[in-house]
């Protein structure tokens, strides 16, 4: 059976569909399900750990592709281990590579139907604007680190349900394959639930490197104060980079973070060679259909 396509200019548009299966939850948590379903594999967790302000949790493993920036280009790693390198502006390459990719859905309740998840580093802005780039690369992590997700689990806090979603060919054969995989995913999610597990977290962090001394940091604070007085800025987030040595596992650190600083926007990405852990009180931008939402702090036309 041929993959369904539609003509789009001179390109052939690849059409896929999101198939799903929903089951009820009793008292299973997102962390318990993640540990059972994803475990130590390459994967992600986007969690709302504030049920009053967030509804959904998404998690997945074994991405179809991993996309990373490399100098002036992209490296695309397939699930089978093969790689493809593209040269040019990474933002333009991303748009071009996935412009012919469309996911359709039958269930309008699906808040997420698959696609790219991951992180964009601060230097991502340099792909869109001409800015000085004199800072050394201290950590060696790609500015763009994304996963193409075509199978994942979604937890709905309000409905107290879990949905397995698989993106497959928009054909009868694709539907059968996807629904079989959905059944497997539900079993995997509950197979190794550990409800009485105790936290193994033991604070052992040792700071071995700081980006600023107290004097250097204080000098930057005073400089920002002057910028505000002069009217150049009205707010600045001043950060520091600390390198901390620890024996803790990445996901254990994430679990500790969600207890210390729970929020509607928590995230954990395991790219195997590195992990990203974070918690935010608010979103920056969201597009749903033809509507675009921004928080007041970041409201700007610059994204255009």
Name each model feature, range by range.
Residues 1-11:
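N-terminal amphipathic/basic-hydrophobic helices that include classical n-h-c signal peptides
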Residues 12-300:
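Extended alpha-helical targeting/anchoring segments
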């Amino acid at each position: 059976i041929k993959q369904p396509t539609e003509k789009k200019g001179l390109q052939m548009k690849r059409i896929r569909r999101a198939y799903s299966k929903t089951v009820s939850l009793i008292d299973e948590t997102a962390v318990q399900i993640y540990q059972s379903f994803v475990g130590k594999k390459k994967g992600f967790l986007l969690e709302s750990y504030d049920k009053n302000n967030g509804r959904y949790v998404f998690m997945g493993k074994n991405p179809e592709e991993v996309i990373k920036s490399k100098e002036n280009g992209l490296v695309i790693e397939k699930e089978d281990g093969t790689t493809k390198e593209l040269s040019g502006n990474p933002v333009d390459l991303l748009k071009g590579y996935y412009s012919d990719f469309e996911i359709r859905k039958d269930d309008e309740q699906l808040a997420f139907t698959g696609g790219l998840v991951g992180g964009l580093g601060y230097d991502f802005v340099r792909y869109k604007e001409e800015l000085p780039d004199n800072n050394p690369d201290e950590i060696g992590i790609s500015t763009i680190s994304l996963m193409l997700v075509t199978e994942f689990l979604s937890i709905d806090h309000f409905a107290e349900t879990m949905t397995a979603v698989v993106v497959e060919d928009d054909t009868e054969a694709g539907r059968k394959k996807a629904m079989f995989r959905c059944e497997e995913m539900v079993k995997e999610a509950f197979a190794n639930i550990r409800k009485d597990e105790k936290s193994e977290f033991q604070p052992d962090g040792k700071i071995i490197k700081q980006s600023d001394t107290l004097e250097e940091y204080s000098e930057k604070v005073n400089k920002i104060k002057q910028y505000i007085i002069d009217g150049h800025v009205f707010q600045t987030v001043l950060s520091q980079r600390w390198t901390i040595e620890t024996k803790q596992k990445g996901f254990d650190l994430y679990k500790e973070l969600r207890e210390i600083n729970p929020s509607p926007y928590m995230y954990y990405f395991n790219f195997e060679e590195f992990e990203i852990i974070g918690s935010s009180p608010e979103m920056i931008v969201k597009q749903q259909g033809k509507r675009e939402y921004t928080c007041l702090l970041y409201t700007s036309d610059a994204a255009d």
